[in-house]
Amino acid sequence: MQKKHTQYPHTTIPLAAGSGGAASDELIREIFLPHLGRFFVSEGEDAGVFSAGDSAKDFAISTDSFVISPIFFNGGDIGKLSICGSSNDVAMMGAKPEFITLGFMIEEGLGQDELEKIIKSIACEVERTDLKILSADTKVLPKGSIDKLFINTTCIGKVLKSGISSKALQKGDKIILSAPIGAHGASIFASREGIGLHSNLQSDCAQLYEMLEPLFGGDFEIHAMRDATRGGLSAVLNEWANASKAQIEIDEECIYIDEEVRGVCEILGLEAYMLANEGVCALSVEPSQASEICEILRSHPLGRYASIIGEVTEVSSTHKASSNQNLAKDTKARVVLKNKWGSKRFMEYPQGELLPRIC
């Protein structure tokens, strides 16, 4: 009898495997890592860190593919998103984004004006942070092969603040959130569901390096940092808890959620903690520096609502990661959400697919 190589429970790949939640983790753990895991330089991070020649600095690199629908949305488009997304992944490793590559998969019949508008948007974001384009590629596919336009990007940057890792949480660390959550996911949901909101709700899509740069140049102890994209804040915190085998306690009252986002969540029965963001990051930092770090973030428009939302209450000395799907069963690796009355519940790792093609 042929030995089964994986424990993956599906014969075909479900849509939920692209959610950034438990199903994504399962796909990576059971299909990709058994074959490719030994080759990974930086497993579990949004960007890999490597050395190049005689350079005194390390470099961070991240690749990402963008398939959002619709390709134009309130607050941005797929072009802006592709630059912000890759740039932010590199910045989360304490690096300054410097170079980017672009790959365009274009559906036959896409309007010239639509494509040009997206290219102009890319140019605007590249110029904003002085990124340099190393290489680019275009493919045009027969109508129906894809939906309008997909973009792949790879970003490279020089590491200015080393040691940042989801495995580096320490007991007592303060958890900082840079901005209100859920705006990107809620705005895309509202657009697709045809919810007519008389408000300013729009995606928070933005490059975060400029806001974070002052932290990279100082003696700040940033142990972990992640932008809360697919799976939202819930996915980030649960990934950290799993990687560091830590218990994280979050104060629900300290998490800022715009009223428009709350409204969409109530209408559609969503949890804001699980909604995607494209201009929000979480940090786990040395407790004695947390207030100063918050003040620095608040000095930038993108971080004006930065706040301490919780802390790391326990860290296992073994740091042996468990399955993300079983966080709630583990005595250490879990995220606990405390409400204003003092009641506590687990902030669950996202299950299923809330919204396909969110980024």
How would you label these PLM feature ranges?
Residues G18, S65, M105, D137-K139, ...:
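Short, ordered loop/turn segments at secondary-structure junctions
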Residues P14, A22-L177, A183, I188, ...:
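Glycine-rich phosphate/pyrophosphate-binding loop regions near the starts of catalytic domains
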